[in-house]
Structures are given as structure tokens and as C-alpha cells.
């Protein structure tokens, strides 16, 4: 494959830094990025899009609902997953930077069998942090682990190493997947997102979704599912219940069967419904789960009139002629701590 040049960007965060330091708007963009560089681009590559600075375009350069954004609301700014929808992101050239935990094979290579990641300086060298901050991106990840799994991340790290590692790998992938699904759903104003970033520059729990040696981390597989050309997923619409989504970004019409299941663990199916679905190329389909079910089942567990009837909602898309689902999405109405796991938290 060949490298293709599509966009030329003048700089990264120059306008943002000037604005955050309190400079007036006339000082955010200097003549080189405002006049000289775009003139050169027009002369030599008039076919390309020129962006003076990333981020830029809003009332403030770092405003995320206009122009080009850097979105770390879900992430460094510790906002809840709902912020991805509230912020109205239109396009983000950087987003969802987390300290993604590598696989055990790399941990063993780094520290010897059985040694746990923690506060040791040699481990922290591989954990990203912003200059001048009192926290790093491992603190960010542990914040969400505590919030989503209702456990004390610090205590868990020392008391149950295996569970801590499993949840740290899972939580960053889940946050990325949920955010991207929010942006891909029908009605979203978002037209694209670039993850920060692909590959770690050194061994450790870096921003990369693959480690420094090219081995995918858990987050990579969550992204693979949520960014697939053909995707099926569920979103929580509050008192309106769960919504079912199917996205077809391929050049071909999708034909097949969509199946929604509500599952009560460990082994009961409380509801199951299937329907034929045909979806044109480059299109989206959305329907409320309540419209597919025969009666009200509080799919998002928003009304809470009694005990939760299902811990997992599963949506599967199976293409015509295939024996296995081509896409799947899941929701956890009662939270991510499932009955079989609750003893360990």
C-alpha cells in the first residue's frame, strides 16, 4: 500500500496554547500559518485541504463542537462516558488517549514472571503523562476502573493482580468502543475520529493500542469491532430504553438477520427477537429495542420498578448466507459488575 497525502496541517496545538494562556484572539495565529504556508500549499498542492492548526475552528481553538477538535473529555478530563454525546464533537484529530495495559507476555519480558505493574520508576517510564501535571494516564485509567467496576483500583492492584490486569485491559477498550459507537450512531454530528494513538514508542502501558513490538493490546480488538465497516451496537437512551443500531459503511447492500437477546445470568434468556434487515451501502439503521419486543421490559433498567430482569443485552447481525454473526454489540443495563464477578470486587 502507498502513503497518500490528503491534508496539510500547519501545527499542533499552537492556537490552543496561546488561547489557554490568555492571549487575545489576534495573537492565536501568526502570519506564517495564516498566510505564508497556505499560499505555498495552494501553489504546490492545490488539491489538498489545509488546516492552520489542530485543534482550531471554534470560538476557542479547543472548542470540540466546531472545526477540528482534540477530544479528551472521556479520558484525561475524567468526564463520564455521556460527555462524548454532550460535547457534540464534529471531527477529532486526537482522542481517547489511555494508558493501555499490554499483554502478560510483555509484562513478563519487562519485569520477570509475577512482578506487578505499579509505582516503581522503571514501570512509570513507560506510562505517558502531560508535562507539569501531578497525575499520569495510569491514574486516568484507574479512575474509570473504579467508577465503572465499583471497586478500589489501588487495593485491587495489590490484592488481586490477575483481576486488576484483566479489568485495566478491559476498561480502556470499553470506553473507546462506547465513545465511537456514540459518534457512529444515527443522528450523530460526528464525521470522524483519529485515535491517540497506534503504537507505543517504548515498552509499557502507553497510549498505543499495539505495544512497542507490534502486539495488539485488548483495546485494539474493541476498536476493531466498533470501527468495523459493518457494525451493530446498542446505546442507552435513558428513559427511552436501549436503541439498536446497524451501520453499513461498505459499498454493498447488507442483507441478513438482526437478533436482539436479553440475558439473565448465568444462563437464562428473558427475551429474544429476530428480524430480516436490508441496509443500503453507506447508510445507518436505528430502532428502539421496545419497538422490537412484545411488551415493556425496561431494557435500559431506567425505571427500576423491581429487580433487574437482564444483566446483558446482546445485538447480533448475521449476513445472509453466513453461519456466524458478522457484527455484535452489547449493553449492561445493571452495570459492568456481573453476578459471577461481584465477589471479586
Indicate where each model-derived feature is located.
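Intrinsically disordered, low-complexity Pro/Gly/Ser/Thr-rich segments with frequent PxxP/GP/PP motifs
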Residues: 259-306
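Acidic/polar loop patches that form or flank catalytic/metal-binding clefts of enzymes
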Residues: 6-7, 43-54, 61, 191-192, ...
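Active-site neighborhood of glycoside hydrolase catalytic domains
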Residues: 2-63, 171-174, 213-214, 218
Amino acid at each position: 500500500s502507498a502513503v497518500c497525502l490528503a491534508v496539510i496541517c500547519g501545527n499542533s496545538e499552537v492556537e490552543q496554547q496561546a488561547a489557554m494562556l490568555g492571549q487575545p484572539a489576534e495573537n492565536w495565529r501568526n502570519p506564517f500559518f495564516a498566510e505564508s504556508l497556505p499560499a505555498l500549499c495552494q501553489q504546490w498542492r492545490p488539491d489538498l485541504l489545509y488546516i492552520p492548526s489542530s485543534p482550531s475552528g471554534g470560538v476557542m481553538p479547543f472548542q470540540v463542537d466546531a472545526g477540528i477538535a482534540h477530544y479528551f473529555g472521556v479520558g484525561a478530563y475524567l468526564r463520564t462516558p455521556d460527555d462524548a454525546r454532550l460535547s457534540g464533537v464534529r471531527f477529532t484529530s486526537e482522542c481517547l488517549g489511555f494508558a493501555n495495559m499490554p499483554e502478560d507476555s510483555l509484562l513478563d519480558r519487562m519485569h520477570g514472571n509475577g512482578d506487578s505493574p505499579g509505582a516503581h520508576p522503571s514501570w512509570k517510564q513507560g506510562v505517558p503523562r502531560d508535562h507539569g501535571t501531578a497525575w499520569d494516564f495510569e491514574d486516568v485509567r484507574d479512575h474509570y476502573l473504579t467508577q465503572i467496576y465499583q471497586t478500589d483500583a489501588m487495593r485491587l492492584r495489590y490484592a488481586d493482580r490477575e483481576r486488576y490486569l484483566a479489568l485495566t485491559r478491559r476498561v480502556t477498550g470499553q470506553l473507546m468502543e462506547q465513545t465511537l459507537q456514540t459518534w457512529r450512531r444515527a443522528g450523530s454530528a460526528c464525521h470522524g475520529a483519529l485515535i491517540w494513538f497506534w503504537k507505543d514508542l517504548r515498552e509499557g502501558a502507553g497510549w498505543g493500542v499495539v505495544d512497542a513490538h507490534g502486539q495488539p493490546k485488548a483495546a485494539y480488538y474493541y476498536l476493531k469491532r466498533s470501527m468495523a465497516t459493518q457494525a451493530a451496537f446498542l446505546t442507552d437512551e435513558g428513559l427511552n430504553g436501549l436503541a439498536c443500531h446497524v451501520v453499513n459503511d461498505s459499498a454493498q447492500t447488507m442483507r441478513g438477520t438482526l437478533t436482539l437477546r436479553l440475558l439473565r445470568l448465568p444462563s437464562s434468556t428473558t427475551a429474544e427477537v429476530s428480524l430480516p434487515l436490508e441496509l443500503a451501502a453507506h447508510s445507518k439503521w436505528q430502532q428502539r429495542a421496545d419497538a422490537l419486543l412484545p411488551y415493556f421490559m425496561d431494557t435500559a433498567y431506567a425505571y427500576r420498578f423491581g429487580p433487574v430482569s437482564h444483566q446483558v443485552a446482546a445485538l447480533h447481525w448475521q449476513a445472509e448466507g453466513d453461519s456466524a454473526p458478522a457484527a455484535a454489540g452489547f449493553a449492561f443495563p445493571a452495570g459492568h459488575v456481573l453476578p459471577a464477578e461481584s465477589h471479586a470486587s
